[in-house]
Design a protein with these regions (language model features):
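Short glycine/serine/threonine/alanine-rich loop segments
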Residues: 32
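Histidine-anchored nucleotide/phosphate-binding helix
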Residues: 16-28
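Short, flexible coil/turn micro-motifs enriched in small/turn-prone residues
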Residues: 6-9, 88
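Extracellular/lumenal mucin-like low-complexity stalks
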Residues: 1-5
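Secretory-pathway luminal glycosyltransferase catalytic domains
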Residues: 39-150
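A short, glycine/small-residue-rich beta-strand->loop->alpha-helix junction that serves as a flexible
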Residues: 8-18, 145-147
Length: 150
């Protein structure tokens, strides 16, 4: 069983998506079962995968007790982790490379479908706009929480 016990503790939704995707990709490569923490996940308040996305119905929920952790050693792809990750460990780190999950791309596209309660209001807003809508993403991120200048 491959897990990501601390998913959500290292960042917000984008980081959690990378963590989840990496877990699925490595598990699929080795034929391991995999699981993610349940929605409440020990009180981590920004753990939001469950509330945002229609995650795989095949997922198991829980955390591995008394397990070893596999720590990402740096902020780019690590062949050793992808090619030789042992079973019965929990991943830890950011894992921000598509190479960890390119093998499960189609599954992830399904998993990362927004719940209708999020998607429908967005569709309604887009439909209400005359002309061609333009979307702009402004990343404000963590500095807004600590820097009074925003």
């Amino acid at each position: 069983m491959l897990a990501f016990n601390n998913i959500g503790s290292l960042g917000r939704l984008g980081n959690q998506m990378f963590e989840y995707a990496t877990l699925r990709g490595i598990a699929a490569k080795h034929g391991y079962d995999w699981m993610i923490p349940p929605p409440e996940n020990g009180g981590i308040e920004n753990y939001s995968l469950h509330s945002c996305f229609k995650l795989s119905p095949d997922r198991k929920e829980g955390v591995l007790d008394k397990c070893n952790y596999v720590q990402e050693p740096y902020f780019h792809f690590c062949d050793e982790i992808f090619d030789r990750c042992p079973d019965n460990v929990s991943l830890h780190g950011f894992f921000q490379s598509w190479r960890y999950f390119h093998n499960v791309e189609n599954e992830l596209r399904k998993d990362f479908t927004f719940h209708d309660s999020i998607l429908q209001p967005c569709k309604d807003m887009i439909d209400s706009v005359d002309g061609d809508p333009i979307m702009l993403h402004v990343r404000r991120g963590d500095p807004n929480l600590t820097d009074p200048r925003g």
